[in-house]
Amino acid sequence: MAKKIVGFIKLQIPAGKANPSPPVGPALGQRGLNIMEFCKAFNAQTQGMEPGLPVPVVITAYADKSFTFVMKTPPATVLIKKAAKVDKGSSKPHTDKVGKITRAQAEEIAKTKMPDLTAADLDAAVRTIAGSARSMGITVEGV
């Protein structure tokens, strides 16, 4: 028989930097999960990633105090800001442009995000990434 699920916990944790302090500790502690076990497993799985890159994770908590977790790809906005070499998007996105990325950079981001996007093919994924970039005040060349 399958384990009884008692809840899902969604967090964004920097790669390789999970520790028992907030937000991780309180979120897992409320469900009675082993915080250090999660931190060690998460840090081990994110070892190959760029340190500090925020990684969305969905933790499934079971009635017997065990858990499983699924990591998603980093948010598109973080990848776009990194490619454009800017710290934050524009406060007036359609008026003030804060940076630019090329189509090749948008394709690279789309390939990274492809498992989490609903796009049917790479071209549709590139258009999705380009739309996100435009809404941040970042120009996409060649799209």
UniProtKB/Swiss-Prot annotation:
GO CC terms, sorted: cytosolic large ribosomal subunit
GO terms (BP aspect): translation
Entry's Gene Ontology molecular function annotations: large ribosomal subunit rRNA binding; structural constituent of ribosome
Protein's UniProt keywords contain Ribosomal protein: yes
Cross-referenced SMART domains: RL11
InterPro entries, per the entry: Ribosomal_uL11, Ribosomal_uL11_bac-typ, Ribosomal_uL11_C, Ribosomal_uL11_C_sf, Ribosomal_uL11_CS, Ribosomal_uL11_N, Ribosomal_uL11_N_sf
SUPFAM superfamilies: Ribosomal L11/L12e N-terminal domain (SSF54747), Ribosomal protein L11, C-terminal domain (SSF46906)
Entry keywords, A to Z: Methylation, Ribonucleoprotein, Ribosomal protein, RNA-binding, rRNA-binding
Modification after translation: One or more lysine residues are methylated.
Keyword RNA-binding set for record: yes
Function summary: Forms part of the ribosomal stalk which helps the ribosome interact with GTP-bound translation factors.
NCBIfam families in UniProt: L11_bact
Entry similarity comment: Belongs to the universal ribosomal protein uL11 family.
Subunit-structure text: Part of the ribosomal stalk of the 50S ribosomal subunit. Interacts with L10 and the large rRNA to form the base of the stalk. L10 forms an elongated spine to which L12 dimers bind in a sequential fashion forming a multimeric L10(L12)X complex.
The protein, known as: Large ribosomal subunit protein uL11
Origin species: Burkholderia mallei (strain ATCC 23344)
